[in-house]
UniProtKB/Swiss-Prot annotation:
Domain of life of the organism encoding this protein: Bacteria
Record-annotated membrane-spanning stretches: 13-33, 51-71
This protein's name: ATP synthase subunit c
Function recorded in the entry: F(1)F(0) ATP synthase produces ATP from ADP in the presence of a proton or sodium gradient. F-type ATPases consist of two structural domains, F(1) containing the extramembraneous catalytic core and F(0) containing the membrane proton channel, linked together by a central stalk and a peripheral stalk. During catalysis, ATP synthesis in the catalytic domain of F(1) is coupled via a rotary mechanism of the central stalk subunits to proton translocation.
Coiled-coil positions: none
Length: 74
């Protein structure tokens, strides 16, 4: 196997984490919508926690993308 092919394969495997991130973000906002539908008065508190969860989950995606770029270009 060529080195370039191994790098491309490794970068592709490291990006698989993005599928989990997409599912996680979907679950966060689905739960956010469901909780606001049940109790509209708690919207502000639940929304801030949801945005925090989104940011932390998105950080995992950025780390996976960083690893993929390091594999490809380093």
């Amino acid at each position: 196997m060529d080195v370039a092919a191994a790098k491309a394969l490794g970068a592709g495997i490291s990006v698989i984490a993005l599928a989990g991130v997409g599912l996680g973000i979907g679950n966060i906002f689905a739960s956010l919508i469901a909780s606001v539908a049940r109790n509209p008065s708690s919207r502000d508190q639940v929304f801030s926690i949801g945005i925090l969860g989104f940011a932390l989950t998105e950080a995992v995606a950025l780390f996976a993308l960083l690893i993929a770029f390091l594999i490809l270009f380093a």
